[in-house]
Amino acid sequence: ALDDIPFLYSDLSDFENRIIYYESSRGCPFRCKYCLSSIDKQLRLRSLDLVKKELQFFLDKKVPQVKFIDRTFNAKHEHALAIWRYIKENDNEVTNFHFEISADLLTEKEIILLNSMRKGLVQLEIGVQSTNPDTIREINRSMDLCKLKCAVEKVNSAGNIHQHLDLIAGLP
């Protein structure tokens, strides 16, 4: 279980100018041909109580940035919402949280929550990989470009979240 993996940051004391990498899940429900994460066929989650406890440690230490390295952070909506709510409710006005997401999976409830956060609290790295429908099909990527565009525009409309979109050069 992911909860058995020890929290390695508790022995550190100096977090100034550090970026912390953190994982609340492993695996990915998708089967994209280019990605090693598709080998791990199931999405496994660290318990929310443990995640909140560990996030509070980062917040208390005023870590400048916590970068979630979950492959698709918002693949499990309840998990993502609970973490985003916790971050908003416990904002220390210093720490920034970075998430790798699939924008076409964002729900209206998630967009409303994200748009209500303080400017700079969250940044989103959005996996697009390609906008060519033939390429998307060839790489076995599950994505709705219209939903993605709409979600990116809705998040962008609040002006509080930095977003960047990932594209992979050299795909078929």
Residue ranges and their predicted role:
Residues I5-S157, A169:
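Radical SAM [4Fe-4S] cluster-binding motif and immediate context
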Residues A1:
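Glycine-rich beta-alpha loop elements in corrinoid/cobalamin-binding modules
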